[in-house]
């Protein structure tokens, strides 16, 4: 082949350098499938600016965005799960724990902290769905109880953000025991008059929804969160019927009276502060309009 033929036989694309786009710069919305700039999405608290879909958010990031800057202090950060049953399904439970810890950088699926919200003392907790589906095992139960006890000690509100597939099957009855354990400590809080607010996020299912997640003095949900005991596919397979549109979503539950309110993530911080100031008889951190009677 002559030199001139070699030049013209080259593909136009072979001389074009591909753009080197670092991984993680762009994120596709799981609802509308719009491609979003990741930094913009992070600034928007992982809510799609195009369609308003609330994506899942890292538990630690959620709590740090909620609390006043530099006010957070972690509770029971040293607790780690143990494979006391030597459980094995397709993989050893011990290996699943190690993989989840490596992937998330967390020791288990619940993060608990003290801090302030608009200068009001508060105890907070959040489930990390990325850690084994946010499942509740012995450590999750223990950390929840320690957080509740801290709230009673400080006489301040406790707010928990749930995102879980339910009890952790690899811990068998030890995980189911956490349902009673967490419910019992909330009963103690109620006796002492310490407020507990439960915020249900997508998804909140199984043993978590059947215990502490639905036991708030006020039960709040994020928009379109999936909330229930069994998931919709399991229910459809059991009853052999098509479920109503939006069944088990937060809007459906609000309509049926199962939850108290739906709050957008961007409004969560201000809403919680306003509600907690009323529950604790403290001045509101915001200037609220005076109520005017109809006959005035």
UniProtKB/Swiss-Prot annotation:
Location(s), subcellular: Cytoplasm
Alphabetical keyword list: ATP-binding, Cytoplasm, Fatty acid biosynthesis, Fatty acid metabolism, Lipid biosynthesis, Lipid metabolism, Metal-binding, Nucleotide-binding, Transferase, Zinc, Zinc-finger
A GO biological process held by the record: negative regulation of translation
SUPFAM superfamilies in the record: ClpP/crotonase (SSF52096)
Record has Acetylation as a keyword: no
Cofactor note: Binds 1 zinc ion per subunit.
Function: Component of the acetyl coenzyme A carboxylase (ACC) complex. Biotin carboxylase (BC) catalyzes the carboxylation of biotin on its carrier protein (BCCP) and then the CO(2) group is transferred by the transcarboxylase to acetyl-CoA to form malonyl-CoA.
Protein name (record): Acetyl-coenzyme A carboxylase carboxyl transferase subunit beta
Organism in which the protein naturally occurs: Haemophilus influenzae (strain ATCC 51907 / DSM 11121 / KW20 / Rd)
UniProt lineage: Bacteria, Pseudomonadati, Pseudomonadota, Gammaproteobacteria, Pasteurellales
Gene name linked to the record: accD
